[in-house]
């Protein structure tokens, strides 16, 4: 539990540090996340001194798990600190669907069964920092955002790689969408044309994402100038920044402003007209298309399940990941062979 307290504190600090870079909706989410984590840390501090005794009682297999862990410092009897994304995150939406964490109830409504014990992070960067700083945590990020600060585990024996996604061996993948409402401005359309051209698709491929059109034509700008506001998913943002850099290099009259938040906020902004192009790391919801949005898939991306670099776990089944995120599996001795 001490690990979890530290993780909550780290998450709260990271969420607070990112407030300045987000829009109003992002600010509210980050503040809420930071306040919640601070309160949770305060509440948990009183129980922290008893964490050793509590973790020792996790399962009847504690003795065997401890013996298996003698070869290293990783203690299998520790609780799993589950780290998830916020409501509204396209990555969370895709993750819970692909792993079966989201299920329909008797009324046919979709229910997110993510454990209430999950630590909530409000961006890809905070997720990476949280897992990299907590030896006993587990999380998930866009494959294109994966770096060596954490370790991606294989799912059912398949590594999270572009080639495995293309071959179908790694099935945890989703689309990156952009969305517009009505007829885009000339400069917004020019930027979209760049993204879907051979030039734009090459940028996508170069940044570890999967292009959707290998036969796209070379880009020819319409010469439009002006400002384009692009808002939404923190998973799509990194590759959108790369696309922006490449585009303005060939059309210096264009100004591209990227506002990072989450998929739902981006789609709402596109519907409201407060941005020109929305970003979503998932399929659009019926309510969003009914609200007048037109989606364009610009890339495919995998979702990598991540653990701390000091965690010896290298492979998990989809059922095990589901069990962890629904709270059925609570300690690493229920995972590590």
Regions found by a protein language model. Give the residues of each.
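Positively charged n-region of N-terminal signal peptides that target proteins for export
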Residues: 1-5, 10
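Alpha-helical transmembrane segments
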Residues: 12-16
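C-terminal motif of bacterial Sec signal peptides marking the signal peptidase cleavage site
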Residues: 17-21
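Exported/periplasmic ABC-transporter solute-binding proteins
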Residues: 23-39, 43-337
């Amino acid at each position: 539990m001490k690990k979890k307290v530290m993780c909550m504190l780290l998450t709260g600090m990271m969420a607070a540090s990112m407030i300045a870079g987000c829009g109003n909706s992002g600010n509210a989410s980050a503040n809420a996340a930071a306040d919640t984590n601070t309160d949770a840390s305060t509440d948990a501090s009183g129980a922290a001194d008893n964490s050793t005794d509590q973790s020792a009682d996790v399962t009847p297999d504690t003795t065997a798990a401890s013996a298996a862990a003698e070869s290293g410092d990783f203690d299998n009897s520790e609780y799993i600190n589950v780290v998830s994304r916020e409501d509204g995150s396209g990555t969370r939406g895709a993750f819970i669907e692909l792993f079966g964490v989201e299920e329909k109830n008797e009324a046919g409504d979709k229910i997110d069964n993510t454990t209430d014990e999950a630590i909530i992070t409000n961006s890809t960067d905070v997720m990476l920092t949280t897992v990299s700083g907590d030896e006993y945590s587990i999380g998930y990020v866009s494959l294109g955002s994966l770096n060596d600060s954490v370790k991606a585990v294989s799912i059912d024996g398949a590594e999270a790689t572009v080639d495995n996604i293309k071959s179908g061996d790694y099935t945890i993948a989703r689309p990156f969408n952009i969305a517009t409402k009505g007829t885009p401005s000339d400069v917004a359309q020019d930027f979209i044309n760049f993204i879907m051209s051979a030039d734009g698709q090459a940028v996508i491929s170069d940044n570890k994402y999967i292009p959707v059109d290998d036969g796209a034509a070379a880009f020819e700008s319409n010469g439009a100038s002006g400002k384009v506001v692009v808002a939404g998913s923190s998973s799509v943002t990194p590759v959108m920044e790369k696309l922006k850099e490449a585009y303005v290099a060939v059309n210096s009259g264009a100004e591209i402003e990227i506002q990072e938040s989450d998929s739902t906020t981006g789609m709402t902004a596109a519907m409201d007209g407060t941005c020109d192009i929305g970003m979503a790391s998932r399929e659009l919801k019926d309510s969003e298309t009914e609200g007048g949005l037109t989606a364009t898939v610009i890339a495919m991306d995998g979702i990598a399940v991540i653990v701390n670099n000091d965690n010896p776990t290298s492979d998990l089944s989809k059922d095990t990941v589901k069990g962890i995120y629904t709270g059925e599996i609570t300690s690493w001795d229920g995972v590590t062979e």
